[in-house]
A protein has these predicted regions:
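C-terminal helical cap(s) of enzyme catalytic domains, especially alpha/beta-barrels
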Residues: 63, 233-267
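Short gly/pro/ser/thr-enriched loop/turn and capping motifs at secondary-structure boundaries
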Residues: 104-106, 208, 231-236
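Terminal or standalone catalytic/regulatory effector modules within metabolic enzymes
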Residues: 28, 34-59, 313-330
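A mid-to-C-terminal "edge-of-domain" accessory segment
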Residues: 2-3, 7-9, 253-330
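Active-site PLP-lysine loop of aminotransferase-like
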Residues: 174, 226-235
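Alpha/beta enzyme core
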Residues: 3-5, 11-41, 59-68, 81-197, ...
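Glycine-rich beta-to-alpha transition loops that act as phosphate-gripper elements at the mouths
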Residues: 73-80, 198-209, 234
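Small-aliphatic-rich amphipathic alpha-helix that forms the alpha element of a beta-alpha
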Residues: 202-230
Length: 330
């Protein structure tokens, strides 16, 4: 089974406190992700944020159109009539990621709308956008709470949208509340109820479970996973791109087109542009990943090479580095 990787470093990742990219930095990251890392899609902005953001997206779409990547460049849109869609068209993008409410609590408390009205609004925007030749994906914001507390509402929406002109329906664990067991059960329920729908899973890392939850979603049958470079994002961040790629490659039978050899370079670039340091012990891309101070472990790797295998070695550009310490056995 082929799994799409959609990276949202430039949209959800930029919601990290203190992080703001220049237009030039956004273009560099976009090119690296699509040309070198070969992620399937990138989400680069939220519509209607600012005139500066509009210009940044234009620079990305102008390059992407020439390079053949335009439909891989996605922008978040809101339920605001056609204002977001028109902003995205003006920016030169072709793919709309429409943000709808995936829980009844969010719908009634935040938007103060009925399910019927919300459904009508969604259908109208989808119809109008597709008439303009645009692709539309749909986020079900707070879907995780929706499945826990208002499942009938979730099913009402998808029952009435499964035949709409949607490319994908995207399932966010917006507040990072789910365990891998819940993710598997909820995603499996969605995939079995709607076998013809392409579902993505969008994890947040509040319990340090984003990678585990993403793997659980893949095992349940979703076709896409959302990531950010270095796990950037609000609160505890999103699913780290390098970590989930290594885990999927080494622990599942799915197919990816990711070039693992470029992941460390990408992490370093985003570290520089974002100003958010990569911890030395960060899995896969941290500088201590292949550094060992314990003599027993170092000897085991030297003689058996038991831990170093598969995508993990390709992801990190280097071999094991043994260092002197009080427990090195020398």
């Amino acid at each position: 089974m082929y799994i799409e990787i959609m990276d949202t470093t430039l949209r959800d990742g930029e919601q990290t406190s203190g992080v703001s990219y220049t237009a030039t930095e956004k273009l560099h990251i976009s090119r690296l992700l699509l040309e070198e890392v070969k992620v399937d899609r990138i989400e680069v902005a939220s519509a209607r944020v600012s005139s500066g953001e509009l210009e940044a997206v234009k620079s990305i779409t102008e390059w992407a159109a020439k390079a053949g990547y335009l439909e891989k460049v996605e922008v978040l849109a809101f339920i605001d009539g056609m204002q977001s869609v028109e902003w995205i068209r003006k920016a030169g993008a072709k793919t709309v990621n429409l943000l709808s409410k995936g829980s009844l609590k969010h719908l009634t408390g935040q938007l103060r709308k009925t399910p019927e009205t919300h459904l009508s609004d969604i259908r109208q925007i989808v119809a109008n956008a597709t008439q303009l030749g645009m692709n539309v994906n749909l986020y079900l914001e707070d879907w995780s709470n929706g499945m826990r507390n208002s499942k009938d509402y979730v099913f009402y929406l998808v029952d009435n949208l499964k035949d709409a002109a949607l490319q994908r329906i995207m399932l966010p664990d917006t507040l990072g509340i789910l365990s891998p067991d819940e993710v598997f059960l909820f995603c499996k329920e969605m995939c079995e109820r709607y076998p013809d729908v392409h579902f993505d899973f969008h994890a947040h890392n509040d319990y340090d479970l984003a990678v585990a939850n993403s793997i659980a979603a893949v095992k349940a049958g979703v076709f896409g996973i959302h990531t950010t470079v270095n796990g950037l994002g609000e609160r505890a961040g999103n699913t780290p791109l390098a970590s989930v790629v290594a885990a999927l490659k080494d622990h599942t039978a799915v197919n990816l087109q990711i070039n693992e050899e470029k992941l460390t370079l990408t992490s370093k670039m985003v570290e520089t542009f974002s100003g958010v340091r990569i911890p030395a012990n960060k899995p896969v891309v941290g500088e201590n990943v292949f550094t060992q101070a314990c003599g027993v472990h170092a000897d085991g790797d030297n003689t058996c090479q038991g831990r170093i295998s598969g995508a993990f070695t390709q992801t990190v550009d280097g071999g094991v580095n043994s260092v002197y310490s009080c427990i090195d056995g020398s």
